[in-house]
Amino acid sequence: MKTAVEELSPTRVKLTIEVPFEELDHAFDVTYKSLAKQVRIKGFRPGKAPAKLIDRYVGRGAVLTQAVNHAVPELYSEAVSKEEVPVLGPPEVEITRLEDGKELAFTAEVDVRPKFEVTDYEGIEVTVDDAEVTEEQVNERLEALRQRFATLIGVDRPAEQGDHVSIDLSASVDGKKLEDAQASGVSYEIGAGTLLQGLDEAIIGLSAGESATFTTTLVGGEHKGREADVTVTVHSVKLKELPELDDEFARLASEFDTIEELRASEAERLGELLRAQQLRQARDRVLEKLVDSIDIPLPESVIKQEADRRRELLDRQLSQSGLSKEAYLEAQEKTEEEFEAELTENATRAVKTGFVLDQLASQENLTASNEELTQYVVEQAQSMGISPDQLFQSLMQANQLQLVYVEVLRAKALDLVVSKAKITDESGNTIEPPTPVHTETITVASGDEETEESAAEQGETEK
C-alpha cells in the first residue's frame, strides 16, 4: 500500500492511498462469503457457491463495490496510523481508480489537529478576589441559620409583609373560570415574589376567611401571557418567629455550647469556602490567559459539531423541564441570533481550550494512573447523584472511557500551568497555587456531557 499526505490547510489534509489488488484478498473473501449466504444457485448449498458463479450471478460490479466498501475503512485506518495523522472526525472518501485485478486508489480528506507548541506557559500572572471574612458575612450566615430554625405562629390579624399565609387562587378571563388556573392550600410568604405580580398587594390587609380580586398576567399554563382576574382567599395567617442569637440557639442549631463558638465556626467555614472559590477562580483565570496567549487555526467542522452538541443538549434539558425555547430566550433576554452567536463563541472557546491542554499534556508526556481515572469517575458520579458503577457502565456502553483519560490529562496539564503561575489577591497578597485537583471538570469540547446526563437519568429511573 502506497500512501501520501497533502496539506490542504493548517487543519485539513488529503490522504492518497493506492492498493494493489492482492492486498484486497481478505476483503474479497469476506464479500464472497457474505454473498454466498444471500444468493441461491442451483446445485449448491447456501454459502457454498464458488466465487466465479457469484460474479456471474450478482455481477462483477456489485462484488467489486461491496469488497471496496469493506476494504476502504480498514485501509484508511492503516494509512492514518502509518502517516501519524491526528485526524478529527470522519473523512470524505473518493474512489479515484478501480482497475479490476490491478489496483484500487482513493483519496480521503479529513480535518486534523492544528500543529503548534505551547510555549511561555510559566509565570502567568493573575489577580483573584480577596478571601477575607467580614463580620457582615458571618452575620448573614447566622441569619440564614436563624431562618432555618424559625417557627410559624398563627395570628388573628390582617396579613403583613413577611407573614406566611395559606391561600386559594382562582383565575378567570372575561368572567369564565380557567380550570387549569386554580390552586388550593398554597403556602406563600408575603414579599417572596415567587407567584403572581400583584399578589402581595392583594393579600396584605386580608385576615383569615377574607378574599380579594386583582388583575394580573398569567405566567404559566395554557393561558400564559393572558391578562386574568385572580381571586385570592386567605385561610390562615402566620407570623415567622426567629430565635434569639444566644447560647441556647447555639446548642439548638449546632454542636457548640456558646454563640461565640458557633460564630467562630461559621467564620472558619466561610473562610474555607472563600479560599476554595479563590483557588477555582485562579484556575479559571490562568486557563483563560493561557488560551488567549495562543493563536491557532480551528477546524470549522469541529466547531460546528461542538455547537450542535451543545444545542441538542439544551433542547433536551428544555424538553425535560417543560420550558419552550422561546420562554428560555425571553428569560435570558436574548434573541435567537444572539443565542446562536454566543453558542458558537462558547463552542469555539471550548474547542480551542481542548486543543491547548491536549498539546501541553503531550509535550510534557503527562499520563494518568488507574487510581486517578477511578477517582475521576467516583467524584463525577457523586456530583451527579449516581453510583460510580452506573457512570462507568454508561461510559462503557457509549465507548467513551477514553474521554475520562482525556479529561484527567487536561486537568493535570492545567494543574501544571497553575503550579507555575503568579497568583495575587486584590490586596496584593501572594496566593499559593492550589493543590492539584486532577478530577475537576474543565469546560472544553470533550463530548462526555451527553453520556453523563444519560447516566444521571438512568440513576433517577432506578431510584
UniProtKB/Swiss-Prot annotation:
Quick one: a GO biological-process term for this protein?
chaperone-mediated protein folding
The UniProt record lists the EC number as 5.2.1.8
- Its chief place of residence is cytoplasm
Q: Which UniProt keywords apply?
A: Cell cycle, Cell division, Chaperone, Cytoplasm, Isomerase, Rotamase
UniProt KW tRNA processing keyword: no
Which terms in the Gene Ontology molecular function aspect does this entry carry? Answer: peptidyl-prolyl cis-trans isomerase activity; protein folding chaperone; ribosome binding
Give me the stretches of Polar residues compositional bias.
427-444
Q: Which domain of life is it from?
A: Bacteria
Q: What are the residue boundaries of the PPIase FKBP-type domain, all occurrences included?
A: 162-243
Report the enzyme's class at the first EC level. isomerase
Q: What does this protein do?
A: Involved in protein export. Acts as a chaperone by maintaining the newly synthesized protein in an open conformation. Functions as a peptidyl-prolyl cis-trans isomerase.
Similarity comment: Belongs to the FKBP-type PPIase family. Tig subfamily.
NCBIfam families per the record? Answer: tig (TIGR00115)
**Protein name listed in UniProt:** Trigger factor
Q: What organism does the record attribute this protein to?
A: Thermobifida fusca (strain YX)
